[in-house]
Amino acid sequence: MLGLATTVTLESSGCSSKMCFRLLCSVSSRPARGTFVEDACWVYIISHTFFPFNMTWRVVNIFISLSMDGALMEIGPYRLQDDHTLIYNNGSWDEFANLLFVDQPVGTGFSYVSTDSYVRELGPMADQFVTFLERWFNVFPEYERDDIYIAGESYAGQYIPYIADAIVRRNEKLSANGTSWNVQGLLIGNGWISPLEQYRSYLPFSYKEGVLDKNSDGAKAAESQLSKCMSKLKEVGKFGVHVDECERVLELILDTTKVDGKCINMYDVRLEDTPDACGMNWPPDISLVTSYLRRPDVVKALNINEDKTTGWRECSPGVGRNLQATESVPSVQLLPGLLERGMPIVLFSGDKDLICNHIGTEDLIHNMTWLNATGFELSPDVWAPRHNWEFEGSAAGIYQQARNLTYVKFYNASHMVPFDFPRRSRDMLDRFLGIDITSIGGDPADSRIDGLKGAPTSVGAHPNSTTAEEKEKEKIKIAAWEAYYKSGEVALVVVAIAASLWGFFIWRSKRREKGLEYKGIYPNLESFSSASLATFRGKRRGRMDVESAPRPDEAELETLYNAAEGSDPQDGEENFSDGKGDNEKAQSHAGMGKSR
């Protein structure tokens, strides 16, 4: 599997987390099923869809993510429909990156423990993840020298810095013949990173968004509880990833919204939920994904270890009860060291999330000191400017950057930004990876920063993308039926049009592939593609059924390339895969899933 980026995406949520460590048990891209005596984790890898054949070297990135709700509801290549058919996700992160989804900590998702060996602290969690990666690279040595990016949301704000720090320490202790792992960047969305700033942000955010009336009795009760919270935080000192007295502040805010059998959704304050859930039933796809991942045929297709006796669930009570992190320092204390080592980090926030809201993220940046300056300070009393983003005529958000740290705020987005805006989030990723669409082919997106166009990006618009392929197929289908209505000669017209259009597509795409060269771009010229919130909250109509449209793999693309160069393809060179899957939502308040 060759690619331009392999990204490891980590998921977790308010009820549990998903990330794999300790024992590599089952890998969907390999047919064999592993067997281990103790705990077992589960991983899912999705290879990129585009590879420049004329490249003589491999510039490959691994993107690690915490697991299946991120894969099927956010950044993976497919989304589920109500009838359990799969449709392409126009905005998936696998176009220029290999995605590695990992159920972690052990006990989440498809991973399991055979004893009461749940992880209890963040340090051991990170060490176990390093053990997982070592075993992963033993099985897939072709990936070990790739660039690695680690991404997640919510409680992954704790996981990701700990994992990155553990990898840095592992590299420092390497023997002379060991292979250093190339962690090139971190992306954390609506992250639970600094409990102090996040707990303090609940009331200001609630007042600003109209969730709570500042003069109400509920506000007074919450303000009183916040005072108790601050006292407790002083008592625990540097240890305070989870503080019960502070959790009560959010509970009181939510209690005030329980009216007429409804409660505000803490992950998207524009929405409501049942009073016993207040957002835990969201997003609407979660019940669909759960039932899909419990189907026996899906479990078998995903190569799940037969020792796993319970069905997939988003939140693991066992993990949540045990991962209290009472002796772990909040990950915000690790960020300065990572930034000072030159590691680029992106913190991004959907502005309608309450539980890990953007005010808390902005405050933690403002109060954090790294590289001899505080916050986004460029020099004494001079601060990095906030740049306005505009995409296709609409305001998309803002970004701000200084000293290896980039902050991105997405307008009108929830706790799960890629769920709301898959194309915008993918555009952010492309900017971070340094993808320049002009060197690949495809139509650049109309993306502007402070009214000026930056380096062009495009989501799904280069000729080899799954989106472009589906558009070509749709053109063929429409043209064929128009011919049928005119003449009734269906078979002849379909063959003629399909041959001509597909031949033109191959010719055009292969001409664009000649001389491809990837140019890095400065990541602060990031932009976003548009996809409205309603796009994936509705029924997502008008997309094609992926189960009837297999995707060509690299062998097929190389066959087409050879054909375009005048060589005859050999019989049997075309291979197709019907890969299914991808995710992330901070679970039980943990990594791409719900929070904490």
Curated annotation (Swiss-Prot):
GO MF annotation list: serine-type carboxypeptidase activity
Glycosylation sites: 54, 90, 177, 367, 372, 404, 412, 464
Active site annotation, chain numbering: 154
Keyword tags: Apoptosis, Carboxypeptidase, Glycoprotein, Golgi apparatus, Hydrolase, Membrane, Protease, Signal, Transmembrane, Transmembrane helix
Superkingdom classification of source: Eukaryota
Catalytic activity: Preferential release of a C-terminal arginine or lysine residue
Keyword Signal: yes
Chain ranges on the Lumenal side, renumbered to this chain: 18-486
Chain ranges passing through the membrane: 487-507
Primary residence: Golgi
Span of the signal peptide: 1-17
Annotated function: Protease with a carboxypeptidase B-like function involved in the C-terminal processing of the lysine and arginine residues from protein precursors. Promotes cell fusion and is involved in the programmed cell death.
Name used for this protein in its record: Pheromone-processing carboxypeptidase KEX1
Gene (name only): KEX1
